[in-house]
């Protein structure tokens, strides 16, 4: 694999008032990939690639691609208020690794298609507002961020797993699209003693199976509070339904649907200072709400608890 990359950055000096600033970044990358399966050194007691060469077109590839990306951000800075707008667009490519290509020899199907590079075109538009409201007591900082995006894929690489085995199988989905809206709001209050963040994601996905176990909706709430030697943190989240595929030998693909769920995490830290040294005692609990959803007998969101002690002299 070889390639070349270059980046051009343009920065404006701002307007006469020194409030508006504009940055433009342009990047270009050329990639060249060449794979040769006949140069592999394989152990014939495990598998002999020469015996399956007539069944599977594997590992002999010569790919190249040009990648362009451009992003621009315009920001306005004023006392107590900063606003930024950005637009990013471009294309990208993901070449199949040899390991991903090897997965296709799991089933010697002469009709299966060779694994092709994944190509993507993307567009994102967003805004960020950061303010320090003087008129609101005990509110140190407020931040709001919103963005919309669209990703178009050609030959989207999808991974599935063999039932009961941690073996990934890769294939291409000819066309796939994902677009959506992402919102995030943050607040710092009482001199940084309490902070909170809420995030909302809503996606429009053309084919849920092309994005295995990807939720089309997600809501998260994070809070952190500090008092004396104690730090308390909590994370609450809710996700929508998820869809994935399981590969069953001699039967093909089975679609798996996981229901929507919600759960929460807790984190507590106590600072220790004994004069001759200092440290922390921390407790972390993840997925504390009981959830019995399992896949092939394996709990997917099992409860986990950690107790950690650190001390430094």
Indicate where each model-derived feature is located:
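C-terminal beta-signal and adjacent terminal beta-strands/loops
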Residues: 93-94, 155, 230, 238-247, ...
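Residues on the lipid-exposed face of transmembrane beta-strands in outer-membrane beta-barrel proteins
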Residues: 4-12, 70-76, 125-129, 181-187, ...
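Transmembrane beta-strands of outer-membrane beta-barrel proteins
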Residues: 20-26, 68-70, 83-87, 140-146, ...
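Residues that define the transmembrane beta-barrel architecture of outer-membrane proteins
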Residues: 1-2, 20, 62-68, 119-123, ...
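Membrane-embedded beta-barrel scaffold of Gram-negative outer-membrane proteins
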Residues: 77-79, 84-96, 100, 117-179, ...
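Gram-negative outer-membrane beta-barrel transporters
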Residues: 31, 137-157, 167-247, 289
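Short loop/turn motifs that connect adjacent beta-strands in outer-membrane beta-barrel proteins
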Residues: 10-22, 75-83, 132-142, 190-193, ...
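Signature of Gram-negative outer-membrane beta-barrel scaffolds
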Residues: 1-81
């Amino acid at each position: 694999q070889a390639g070349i990359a270059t980046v051009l950055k343009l920065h404006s000096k701002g307007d006469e008032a020194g409030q508006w600033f504009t940055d433009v970044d342009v990047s270009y990358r050329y990639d060249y990939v060449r794979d040769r399966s006949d140069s592999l050194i394989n152990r014939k007691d495990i598998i002999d690639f020469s015996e399956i060469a007539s069944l599977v077109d594997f590992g002999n590839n010569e790919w190249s691609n040009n990648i362009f990306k451009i992003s621009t951000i315009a920001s306005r800075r004023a006392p107590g208020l900063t606003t930024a707008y950005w637009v990013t667009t471009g294309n990208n490519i993901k070449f199949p690794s040899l390991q991903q290509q090897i997965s296709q020899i799991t089933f010697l199907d002469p009709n299966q298609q060779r694994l092709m590079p994944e190509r993507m075109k993307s567009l994102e538009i967003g805004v960020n507002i950061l303010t320090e409201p003087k008129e609101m007591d005990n509110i140190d900082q407020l931040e709001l961020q919103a963005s919309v995006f669209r990703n178009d894929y050609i030959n989207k690489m999808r991974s599935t797993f063999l039932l009961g085995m941690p073996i990934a199988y890769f294939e291409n989905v000819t066309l796939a699209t994902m677009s959506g809206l992402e919102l995030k709001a943050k607040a710092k209050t009482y001199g940084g003693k309490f902070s909170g963040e809420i995030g909302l994601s809503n996606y429009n996905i053309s084919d849920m199976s092309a994005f295995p176990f990807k939720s089309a909706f997600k809501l998260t709430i994070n809070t952190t509070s500090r008092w004396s030697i104690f730090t308390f943190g909590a994370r609450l989240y809710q996700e929508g339904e998820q869809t994935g595929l399981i590969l069953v030998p001699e039967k093909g693909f089975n679609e798996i649907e996981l229901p929507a769920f919600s759960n929460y995490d807790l984190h507590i830290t106590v600072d220790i200072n004994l004069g001759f040294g200092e440290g922390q005692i921390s407790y972390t609990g993840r997925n504390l709400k009981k959830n019995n959803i399992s896949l092939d007998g394996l709990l997917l969101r099992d409860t986990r608890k950690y107790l950690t002690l650190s001390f430094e002299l």
